Structure formats: structure tokens, C-alpha cells
Regions:
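Active-site loop/oxyanion-hole signature of alpha/beta-hydrolase fold enzymes
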Residues: 40-86, 98, 261
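Conserved HGGG/HGGXW glycine-rich cap/lid loop of the alpha/beta-hydrolase fold
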Residues: 2-51, 70-71
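Acidic catalytic loop of the alpha/beta-hydrolase fold
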Residues: 220-224
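Conserved hydrolase catalytic core segment
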Residues: 77-121
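Catalytic histidine-centered segment of alpha/beta-hydrolase-like enzymes
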Residues: 247-260
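Conserved alpha/beta-hydrolase catalytic His-Asp/Glu region
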Residues: 116-120, 143-208
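Flexible "cap/lid" loop of the alpha/beta hydrolase fold
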Residues: 103-145
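Short beta-strand/loop motif that positions the catalytic acidic residue
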Residues: 209, 215-217
Length: 273
């Protein structure tokens, strides 16, 4: 975990997507620290965190418990939960677990759940993942070897070529660390974690969330189709939706200045910083 004390006692607690270790917050880290205190942590088996002692403890509930432990470790200050991608599910469930002290939520390019059923507006990933997970379990060394041998620069070029990230607005060097980190994440763990995320849903919680929520979405995000963000905005009692024109799943990097300004406005409007 890393932390920076800012001008406000409120702490913006940042959660990542699966296979991420903070690359998405490269610019927001400094921008947000000018508004409030900030803290960022790593999931089990990600970044500086070791692989889980129990390989089955990799579901949403385990990560939510870890986030709650982080809140207590930093002194249990008032927090605004900030989540990107899978981190939106974690932030929502962290509110369910212990809403006390949560003053607001910021959801970046993420959904309330069942992500493998909506990826690219299809359930293909949900159907393929069980066989992939079975293969990883039966042949862990083989799948780890194949997974780790995909050159990060090649993966980056594919993402740029296919439009999964916008080559006009993103600096490739901002995204390359993600592909380097992915190569070092344990593949069997990744498949189990993704499967758990794909079957989890916090949709039932949305109508009862009684704090301001900012939803930032990209209209070209194929990982989290924008209609899911619109649905969340319509269901949450105190939600604001910002739809970024041309934004993909890494919009916090592509349009980081606009995202920072919009978060600052949200925090100011609601007296959160």
C-alpha cells in the first residue's frame, strides 16, 4: 500500500482492475492528492502483494475484506471509494460491508458485476472461461509459461491496432507497464479471480446506496459497455454520469485532465474535499 497525505482528512481509496497494479492512476495520483489524501493498495497476487496463501480465497469477498483492513490500517478516516474496472465491484461491496465512514464513491469504467457476461456485449467469455480455468488447473506450468511469454510490446501493439485503447489520445508508455505486470500475474489465479468477478453482482445494492456516486464511462469502452454505466446511473439514488466521447477502458489515461477536473468538481460540489 502507498499513501499520501493531502489537504483534506478525507482519503480517496483507490482500487484497481484485475491484473492491474496502479498504472491507471498514473496521473490521477498527483491530481487527486491536491484535493485530498490518497491511498492505493494491491490485490492478492498483484503488485507488491504476495499470492494468496489459500489459492481459493481470490473471490470478491476476500478482496473486499482486504480493502476493509486497509481502511482500518490507515486509521479509518472518512473515505471516498474510487474503483477502476473490477475495482468498481470491490468499491460497491466495500460500501455494503461497512458503509460507515464512506462519504462518496467514484466508479471509473466499471460495472456492478457479471463482467464476463457483458464483455464486448457478449457472454462468450463466460462460456469459454470454465474450460480455460480447467486447463490452467490441470496444466499450471504450461499455461504459466505461455502466459508469461507474450511480449508486452506485442500485446500493446495489438491493443492499439484493434482500438481497445485509443492511439490518438493515449501515450503508449502509460499503458505498457500494465502488459509487463500481466506477464507476472499467476495465470491460474487470474482465471479463478476473473471467474469469481464474472459471477458476482452488486446490482441489488445499487438502490440503497445513500452517498453521492460519480460514474465515469467511455462511449467506446468494449470491456464495460456504456449501457451498463447508464443503468447504474438510473438505479443509484444519488448518481452523476459522465460519458467521455471516444473514451475506452483506459479513459483515465486517455483523458486524464478531464477525468481529474470532473472528480474535483464532484468532490467540491458534495463537500467531500
Amino acid at each position: 500500500m502507498r499513501r499520501r497525505t493531502g489537504p483534506s482528512s478525507t482519503t480517496l481509496l483507490l482500487s484497481d482492475g484485475i491484473c492491474c497494479d496502479g498504472f491507471i492512476y498514473k496521473y490521477l495520483w498527483d491530481d487527486l492528492a491536491r484535493m485530498a489524501s490518497v491511498a492505493h493498495w494491491n490485490y492478492r497476487g498483484h503488485g507488491r502483494s504476495a499470492n494468496p496463501a489459500d489459492p481459493e480465497r481470490i473471490g470478491v469477498d476476500a478482496h473486499v475484506a482486504d480493502l476493509d483492513a486497509v481502511r482500518r490500517e490507515i486509521g479509518d478516516p472518512p473515505v471516498v471509494l474510487v474503483g477502476h474496472s473490477f475495482g468498481t465491484q470491490i468499491s460497491l461491496e466495500a460500501y455494503r460491508l461497512r458503509p460507515e465512514g464512506v462519504r462518496g464513491i467514484v466508479l471509473l469504467c466499471g460495472s456492478y458485476g457479471r463482467v464476463t457476461h457483458t464483455f464486448k456485449n457478449s457472454d462468450v467469455l463466460a462460456n469459454v472461461l470454465p474450460k480455460l480455468s480447467e486447463l490452467a488447473t490441470k496444466h499450471p506450468r504450461l499455461t504459466r509459461a505461455l502466459w508469461s511469454r507474450v511480449p508486452p510490446k506485442t500485446a500493446l501493439r495489438v491493443a492499439l491496432f484493434t482500438g481497445e485503447i485509443d492511439p490518438r489520445t493515449v501515450n503508449p508508455s502509460d499503458v505498457e507497464p500494465y502488459f509487463h505486470h500481466v506477464a507476472h500475474v499467476d495465470f491460474p489465479m487470474f482465471t479463478r479471480m476473473l471467474a469469481a468477478a464474472g459471477e458476482h453482482s452488486a446490482e441489488d445494492l445499487l438502490p440503497s446506496i445513500d452517498v453521492p456516486v460519480l460514474i465515469v464511462a467511455g462511449d467506446r469502452d468494449s470491456f464495460t459497455p456504456p449501457d451498463l454505466s447508464r443503468h447504474m446511473a438510473e438505479t443509484l439514488p444519488k448518481a452523476e454520469l459522465v460519458m467521455l466521447t471516444g473514451g475506452t477502458h483506459v479513459a483515465p489515461l486517455e483523458q486524464h485532465e478531464l477525468v481529474a477536473l470532473r472528480i474535483e468538481k464532484f468532490l467540491t460540489d458534495h463537500g467531500l474535499a
